[in-house]
Amino acid sequence: MKPVFLDFEQPIAELTNKIDELRFVQDESAVDISDEIHRLQKKSNDLTKSIFSKLTPAQISQVSRHPQRPYTLDYIDALFTDFEELHGDRHFADDHAIVGGLARFNGQSVVVVGHQKGRDTKEKIRRNFGMPRPEGYRKALRLMKTAEKFGLPVMTFIDTPGAYPGIGAEERGQSEAIGKNLYELTRLRVPVLCTVIGEGGSGGALAVAVGDYVNMLQYSTYSVISPEGCASILWKTAEKAADAAQALGITADRLQKLDLVDTVIKEPLGGAHRDFGQTMKNVKAVLEKQLHEAQSIPLADLLSRRFDRIMAYGKFS
């Protein structure tokens, strides 16, 4: 797949194009230009390191939405075996913006749930751009309660702009569905591990992100509102999105300092989409460690700690 470059990555894109052109020449002629290709590759890596070492919150927000970033089903394919997807909320419909089911993680049975976006136009529409309706959250809760019934740990992957704000969703109880998930997750009698892999948009993210451990990928975001939405409310223009991103504190490092996130998972150079394999290794290592820790903690302590965590959200000094 041809890499997609964001606006601030254009210098990297230009070098990449030059490297591709030289590789084409190398293949078509007897002239050895491998040294020049290696020189440009090193220059590209150095430039990428330089750019990504000083990303602004607004730029990190762009990376978190990158169209080639791994989505929940990519993590399920890479980290789990024997995945059996389960469908429907048993009340209204099956929401394709939420995927989940039974799987094995290192041979251990678990329940995995996450938001799912689409790659092409047809799939984006089917997945509603990763914005769940109430039936999506009710499906997620049904799967989590199934996990509780059979004593299976729950792993969730968060990547959504937010809960879908359509009239139908509101009529079917969007806020009730989110609130019910928050309530039930604080009481779920199995370990719950949550990982923000892209966008963590408001209550739409939090509805599957109440857990014993909350992780964020290095270039993911987590916020009560998108920078554009915040700018539109406060400044009446989305052009102030960069200022809003700075003020909101949406980045993983910032949220870890506020004790809202346990672990910031390092991403490969250039972001998770540049190296799926390394990203999966990094995520798996963290989840393995946390699952072992969570299963060694007495259930009463686990539930108490989880409840205290969510009740501390919004407190600051």
Swiss-Prot record:
Pathway: Lipid metabolism; malonyl-CoA biosynthesis; malonyl-CoA from acetyl-CoA: step 1/1
Record PROSITE patterns: COA_CT_CTER
Record keywords: ATP-binding, Cytoplasm, Fatty acid biosynthesis, Fatty acid metabolism, Lipid biosynthesis, Lipid metabolism, Nucleotide-binding, Transferase
Biological processes, Gene Ontology terms: fatty acid biosynthetic process; malonyl-CoA biosynthetic process
Protein's cellular compartments: Cytoplasm
Reaction it catalyzes: N(6)-carboxybiotinyl-L-lysyl-[protein] + acetyl-CoA = N(6)-biotinyl-L-lysyl-[protein] + malonyl-CoA
Residues covered by the CoA carboxyltransferase C-terminal domain: 39-293
EC number: 2.1.3.15
Primary localization: cytoplasm
This protein's record includes keyword Transferase: yes
Molecular function in Gene Ontology: acetyl-CoA carboxylase activity; ATP binding; carboxyl- or carbamoyltransferase activity
GO cellular component term of the entry, any: acetyl-CoA carboxylase complex
Top EC class, one word: transferase
Assembly and oligomerization: Acetyl-CoA carboxylase is a heterohexamer composed of biotin carboxyl carrier protein (AccB), biotin carboxylase (AccC) and two subunits each of ACCase subunit alpha (AccA) and ACCase subunit beta (AccD).
Function (record text): Component of the acetyl coenzyme A carboxylase (ACC) complex. First, biotin carboxylase catalyzes the carboxylation of biotin on its carrier protein (BCCP) and then the CO(2) group is transferred by the carboxyltransferase to acetyl-CoA to form malonyl-CoA.
Homology family: Belongs to the AccA family.
Protein name: Acetyl-coenzyme A carboxylase carboxyl transferase subunit alpha
Organism name: Neisseria gonorrhoeae (strain NCCP11945)
